[in-house]
Amino acid sequence: MASEVLVKPQMRGLLARRLRIHMVGAFLVSLGVAALYKFGVAEPRKKAYADFYKNYSAEKDFEEMKKAGLFRSIK
């Protein structure tokens, strides 16, 4: 047993190796979150705005508010 050589543990570069691994993981997670936000929130919102303004008439909306009496300066 005394003739067997024990393998020394790696003592240098442990922090650098862990940081590299965690930075890659954090980068991948941030890309995933950005993609989920874009396709889960931003694109549906953009589509909803486009659908609303496709048939929106400002004059018609103005006339409805005028008939409802929301403007004091217009009679």
Swiss-Prot record:
Broad class of the protein's primary localization: mitochondrion
Superkingdom assignment: Eukaryota
Subcellular location: Mitochondrion inner membrane
Keywords: Membrane, Mitochondrion, Mitochondrion inner membrane, Transmembrane, Transmembrane helix
Membrane topology: Single-pass membrane protein
Residue spans, topological domain Mitochondrial matrix: 1-13
GO BP of this protein: oxidative phosphorylation
Coiled-coil residue windows: none
Function according to Swiss-Prot or TrEMBL: Component of the cytochrome c oxidase, the last enzyme in the mitochondrial electron transport chain which drives oxidative phosphorylation. The respiratory chain contains 3 multisubunit complexes succinate dehydrogenase (complex II, CII), ubiquinol-cytochrome c oxidoreductase (cytochrome b-c1 complex, complex III, CIII) and cytochrome c oxidase (complex IV, CIV), that cooperate to transfer electrons derived from NADH and succinate to molecular oxygen, creating an electrochemical gradient over the inner membrane that drives transmembrane transport and the ATP synthase.
Protein name: Cytochrome c oxidase subunit 6C
